[in-house]
């Protein structure tokens, strides 16, 4: 969230889009406080104790009047229901720290480290009804052959994620205009 807000304030996303809301299902999410401090409207609906479809229906009803063009998942760690995905088909974008054909879900950098991979990937993709299986928008390679700790891989991966996500979003939004 920090990286996207910085790019919207001072960087390549400044004139490319307007952030209308930061939403979370977790009232303690750091992104809510970050957005609030930046003057961005925030909203939270707790998902605790709710089934996925009922929760997503509640979120859809909240978002509907906002006429949102895209939903950008940045640290949102809850699987979306088929109802939500169909409602916002090809308008939900996620970033995943791996080749989505090789590894889906959480722990991608740890997986690359444990498997002694020479390279891994960062992938920006549309969200579909599977986990990290949507159409790839863009994918960049991350050379990890000289890295000896998981921390090094995570740090390098995060740098690439922050740079790449903003660049991909800018291209996507410019193609919409």
Predicted regions, residues:
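Non-catalytic terminal and connector segments of soluble metabolic enzymes
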Residues: 5, 24-42, 66, 70
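N-terminal Rossmann-like dinucleotide-binding module
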Residues: 1-30
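Conserved beta-strand segments of alpha/beta enzyme cores
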Residues: 18-21, 41-43, 91
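Donor/substrate-binding cores of folate-linked one-carbon enzymes
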Residues: 70, 74-176
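Short beta->alpha connector loops at strand-helix junctions that form conserved
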Residues: 43-48, 95
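Short amphipathic alpha-helical segments
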Residues: 3-6, 34-35, 83-86, 106
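N-terminal glycine-rich "phosphate-gripper" loop used for MgATP/nucleotide binding
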Residues: 24-25, 48, 52, 66-82
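Short, well-structured alpha-helical segments in soluble
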Residues: 57-66
């Amino acid at each position: 969230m920090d990286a996207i807000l910085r790019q919207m304030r001072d960087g390549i996303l400044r004139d490319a889009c307007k952030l209308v809301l930061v939403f979370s299902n977790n009232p303690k999410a750091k992104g809510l406080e970050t957005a609030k401090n930046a003057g961005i409207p925030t909203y939270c609906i707790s998902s605790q104790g709710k089934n996925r479809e009922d929760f997503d229906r509640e979120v859809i009803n909240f978002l509907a009047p906002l006429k949102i063009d895209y939903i950008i998942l940045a640290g949102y760690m809850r699987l979306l229901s088929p109802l939500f995905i169909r409602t916002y088909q090809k308008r939900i974008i996620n970033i995943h720290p791996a080749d989505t054909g090789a590894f889906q879900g959480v722990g991608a950098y740890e997986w690359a480290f444990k498997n002694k991979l020479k390279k891994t990937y960062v992938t920006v993709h549309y969200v579909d009804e599977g986990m990290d299986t949507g159409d790839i928008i863009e994918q960049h390679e991350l050379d990890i052959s000289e890295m000896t700790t998981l921390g090094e891989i995570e740090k390098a991966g995060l740098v690439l994620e922050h740079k790449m996500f903003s660049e991909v979003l800018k291209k996507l939004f410019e193609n919409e205009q």
